[in-house]
């Protein structure tokens, strides 16, 4: 069925395939996601099919198991990637996958009343530490906002995401070059042949 969907996407002129290998963040239980992550073999097969059809693959993924499965499968971008550990970041650094943290999807929820700030802060702090570690390790990373998510407006989201990186890492040329490199990799990978 997935192969047929990918062929339909190609016929309709799609530019890439986005898969969802894990659920959403569970804001009531820090460190957990909703639902059950897809099996590693299933993720690998999905990525293989999409790549064979000439598509780059974005993967909505959170949690250690899910992120490791996506990286091992060869996804082109890892969207979100919350709750990773240092081992997973090392795998990411050694791979061809670009991480797109989408920090504002959680940061913009602070003070909005939808979730308790006390539940959001540990997620935010862990994500900030992952960004620092990723920078130090040379993980290929790019900006992305997940625009359209709750409190993430189109247009504003990417500016807020860049500001988040500046707050975490500073605004040095090294940080700018790091993010630019990740973006350039994405631009090359996501050109349909």
Residue ranges and their predicted role:
Residues 33-42, 121-128, 157-161:
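Charged helix-capping and loop-helix junction motifs
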Residues 1-117:
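Metal-coordinating catalytic core of metallo-dependent amide/deamination hydrolases
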